[in-house]
Amino acid sequence: LGVAVYDNVKQTGALMHCLVPSARNTSDKGVSDPYRYVDVGMAKLIQTFLNDGSKKTDLTIVAVGCASMNDSNGTFEIGKKNFTIFRKILWKNNLLLKAHDVGGEMARTLTLKMASGEIWLKKQGEHSKLYG
């Protein structure tokens, strides 16, 4: 799961790439590598913005990815689980998802243009504006 968070007022932003849904069953609960996990990483990323003075209403949040590239028979469904946990975290924090491009079997690349807040997606070699 690739996530872009951008503060429209402060013009600050961040990108995060999470690999698995939860750190719940890890020995250190994700402390050593929080951004690997959707649950711990999103909570930490949101808190970082809020600690820096951002208001929730000023945040643009976009998500891409969650492809099933190495799981063609759907055994693990890591991407689907990642997106489900991500949406629950947004809901619990009263945050809106402004745009997303998830699922399928193709890789994506996310670009955040800090000066403008535009968020671009590259999929199958094609660039398109996802938000902004």
Residue spans for each PLM region:
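A glycine- and small-aliphatic-rich helix-loop capping segment at beta-alpha/alpha-beta transitions
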Residues: 7-12, 77-85
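Divalent-metal-activated hydrolytic enzyme cores
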Residues: 79-132
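Short glycine-rich phosphate-binding loop at a beta-alpha junction
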Residues: 57-65
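Phosphate/ribose-phosphate-bearing ligand recognition and processing surfaces
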Residues: 68-80
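Conserved mixed alpha/beta catalytic, RNA-binding, or beta-rich assembly cores of soluble enzyme
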Residues: 1-52
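Amphipathic alpha-helical interface surfaces
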Residues: 38-45, 59, 82, 86
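Acidic, glycine-rich active-site loops and adjacent beta-strand->loop/helix elements
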Residues: 19-24, 65-69, 103-105
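Generic secondary-structure signature for well-ordered alpha-helical cores
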Residues: 10, 47-55, 68, 91, ...
